[in-house]
A protein has these predicted regions:
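Conserved GTP-binding G-domain of TRAFAC-class P-loop NTPases and closely related GTPase folds
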Residues: 37, 158-230
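Hydrophobic anchor at the beta1->P-loop junction of P-loop NTPases
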Residues: 48
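The conserved Walker
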Residues: 51-52
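Conserved substrate/cofactor phosphate-moiety recognition/catalytic segment
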Residues: 57-117, 158-160
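Conserved phosphate-donor/acceptor-positioning beta-strand/loop module used by diverse small-molecule
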Residues: 143-162
Length: 230
């Protein structure tokens, strides 16, 4: 694969994207907050993070299909809506700001109004900006959600290939910033081993190829009691 010059100096992330973190006792993908049996947990918020091209939208689309009781917020939905309504010659770059502004506004609305049905809420976010990520978790917890972070782990080449496969490539300088923040945080996230950090009940580092099953089961188990889709 050929990459542009501004990306050539990016360093690889230490460690293997396929590493499976050890889970902290009592704090598993099925029980991120370590709730005791018989307790009623808060409705779950799952933030699916990762650099552009990590496969967040693909993972969320699979969850939406497989766990119909869940609520999934993904900017790709708004992108498709704009694309259907705009002339085909209008490039995505021309309305990308509108897509992400709308996604941010809808996400904020869902978090602020708090849980309504008890169904799990899954949100797309790069989650590479630490302050933004922590603010998101704090807001969610203050409004009655049980926030969990799932960071989708990919190699540099896989992230770049993922952007090419989807047909939307982030500007090189923007991707550089995402990747540098990711490399600075990855080891700390992996060391959490699924344990809590700040407002997050659980922080999980998952290889892209391994993420679907645990995230699906996590979402299913947090559907309201009696829901036949559990």
């Amino acid at each position: 694969m050929t990459t542009s010059a501004p990306l050539s100096w990016l360093r690889p992330v230490p460690g293997s994207p396929g590493d499976s973190p050890h889970r902290a006792p009592g704090n598993t993908p099925d029980n991120p907050a370590g709730n005791t049996p018989g307790s009623t947990p808060d409705p779950l918020l799952i933030v699916v993070g990762g650099v552009p091209g990590a496969g967040k939208s693909t993972l969320l689309a699979r969850i939406a299909d497989d766990v119909p009781g869940s609520v999934v917020l993904d900017p790709d939905r708004y992108r498709r809506g704009f694309a259907r309504r705009l002339p085909s010659w209008v490039p995505y770059a021309a309305y990308r700001w509108a897509v992400h502004t709308l996604h941010a506004a809808v996400t904020l609305l869902y978090l602020l109004r708090g849980p309504r049905s008890g169904a799990p809420l899954l949100v797309h976010d790069t989650a590479t900006r630490e302050r933004r990520r922590e603010s998101l978790g704090l807001l969610a917890r203050s409004r009655g959600w049980d926030p969990v972070l799932v960071a989708v782990d990919v190699s540099l080449d896989d992230a770049l290939d993922g952007q090419l496969d989807r047909g939307r490539v982030v500007r090189p300088e923007e991707f550089v910033r995402h990747w540098e923040r990711w490399t600075a945080q990855r080891s700390a996230l992996a060391d959490l081993d699924g344990g809590p950090r700040g407002p997050w009940s659980g922080v999980y580092l998952m290889a892209r190829c391994d993420a679907f099953r645990p995230v699906r089961e996590l979402a299913r188990r947090r559907l309201p009691a009696g829901d036949p889709r559990r």
